[in-house]
Amino acid sequence: MNLKYGVIFSLVAALLLGGCFIVESLSARALNIYVAISFLGCGLAYAVKAPRFWQKRENGTISLTSLLLFAPLHALNWLSLLLAIRLQKERPLHEIEPNLWLGRRLIHGEAAGFSQNSEVAVLDLTAEFAENSNLRNTHYLCIPILDHTAPRQEQLKLAVEFIQSHILNRRVFVHCALGHGRSATVVAAWLLAQNKTQPVDIVIKQIKAIRPGIGLNSDQLAALNKFVENR
């Protein structure tokens, strides 16, 4: 899966660079090269499994260097998220178990409303989005994972431990970009850790019954199956 997206982003970069030989305007060529660098960098990030490409800090912010150098991709990420919110008409988050919430990256009003009346622990699995300022509290943990990829086993273990350490005392919100893949994988891992006899497919169905939009790819399912073997 990583290689697939690496190839796609690299091909887009190659097409943009090829366009430099077609357009005559120097400004258009410069723009093509600028956007191509963004896509090529993202392609390499997927090829070598490097979420640090986005330069997301532990406190949930993204460096100014990343925002400037990869502005076309940041803009594309936000456009994709806002378009998905508008078209899918899905609730931003769902309570899977008491105090355990699974959802997408919240926009400002949603985040303020969710965190307003009670203490919240936030597990942020996005590498490509800065966390909303309302959710970057003292109980915040960022485990940056590239979109459409699976958490490593040590990341799953860390995520499960974070959820377990907070769930008895406060609401825990686990999210990725859309709340369908990376975050669903982590929530499933926590559920599997609580019931060591439950099979992966049953846990996925349990989550899907509450948040129908989830969908784990083959890499994410493989990570869960390996997690079950090691638990």
Pin down the residues of each PLM region.
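A phosphate-binding catalytic loop at a beta-strand-loop-alpha-helix junction
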Residues: 170-188
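N-terminal membrane-anchoring alpha-helices
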Residues: 1-85
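Glycine-centered secondary-structure boundary/capping sites
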Residues: 36, 118, 178-180, 195
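Generic detector of intrinsically disordered, low-complexity, polar/charged segments
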Residues: 3, 15-16, 38-40, 100, ...
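Cysteine-based protein phosphatase catalytic domain of the PTP/DSP
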Residues: 78-172, 190-228
